[in-house]
């Protein structure tokens, strides 16, 4: 018997009856070069390479000194920032519990809570010059519903950035294509000097995700 009181043999039997979708996911993970590289490089997720690639294209981390990572778990993006900008202050926030990362302050809370902006600014000892978000809502399998749920998060993250960034700062976020993208771009263009988007090579080919990079915050 295991510590949970369940017969391990039954778990093996269940594993053999994996759904086709979970089997495909497992096979994809096992054959994914980014997953293998993440393990070799010590990153917690393959998403780390998306930030590395986006930084190479847009210089997102150049000069960053106070960074907020919204939805930090499991921590791959924060690890990249820590490696590229070792002297930067980094604060991550997530509803999920996140394993500690050396040099990173992690707050387990809702970034949309009223007290979140002040708490993050206090932890950074000043306003952030980079707010980044790799968040996506839990999917339900309905493309438009998944799009709207994630875009709701992205828009909330954008407003968080607008309310907290120092002048000249940068906002980076994951977006799911699906119809309301233009509303987000319109919002960002009214608050940032340049707004660009890209799909980094590390994004899976079949994914509808892309990333928006808004630079040169105009101030409040």
From Swiss-Prot:
Its EC number is 2.1.1.166. Pfam families: FtsJ. The keyword rRNA processing applies. It comes from the Bacteria. GO terms for molecular function: rRNA (uridine-2'-O-)-methyltransferase activity. The active site is at residue 174. Residues 1-10 have a biased composition (Basic and acidic residues). The keyword Ion transport does not apply. Keywords: Cytoplasm, Methyltransferase, rRNA processing, S-adenosyl-L-methionine, Transferase. GO terms for cellular component: cytoplasm. Residues 1-24 are annotated as: Disordered. S-adenosyl-L-methionine binds at residues 75, 77, 94, 110, 134. It is found in: Cytoplasm. It is an enzyme of class 2 (transferase). It catalyses: uridine(2552) in 23S rRNA + S-adenosyl-L-methionine = 2'-O-methyluridine(2552) in 23S rRNA + S-adenosyl-L-homocysteine + H(+). Specifically methylates the uridine in position 2552 of 23S rRNA at the 2'-O position of the ribose in the fully assembled 50S ribosomal subunit. Belongs to the class I-like SAM-binding methyltransferase superfamily. RNA methyltransferase RlmE family. This is Ribosomal RNA large subunit methyltransferase E. The gene is rlmE.
């Amino acid at each position: 018997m295991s510590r949970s009181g369940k017969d391990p043999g039954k778990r093996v039997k269940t594993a053999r009856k994996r759904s086709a979708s979970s089997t495909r996911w497992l096979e994809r993970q096992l054959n994914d070069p980014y997953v293998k590289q993440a393990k070799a490089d010590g990153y917690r997720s393959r998403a780390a390479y998306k930030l590395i690639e986006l930084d190479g294209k847009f210089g997102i981390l150049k000069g960053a000194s106070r960074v907020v990572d919204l939805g930090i778990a499991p921590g791959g993006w924060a690890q990249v920032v820590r490696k590229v900008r070792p002297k930067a202050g980094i604060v991550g926030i997530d509803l999920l519990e996140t394993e500690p990362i050396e040099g990173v302050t992690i707050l387990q809370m809702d970034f949309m809570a009223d007290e979140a902006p002040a708490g993050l600014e206090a932890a950074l000892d000043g306003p952030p010059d980079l707010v980044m978000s790799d968040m996506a809502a839990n999917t339900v399998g309905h493309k438009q519903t998944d799009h709207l749920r994630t875009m709701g998060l992205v828009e909330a993250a954008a407003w968080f950035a607008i309310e907290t960034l120092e002048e000249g700062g940068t906002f980076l976020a994951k977006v799911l294509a699906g119809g309301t993208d233009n509303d987000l771009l319109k919002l960002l263009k009214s608050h940032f000097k340049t707004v660009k988007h890209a799909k980094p090579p590390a994004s899976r080919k079949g994914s509808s995700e892309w990333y928006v990079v808004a630079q040169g915050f105009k101030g409040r």
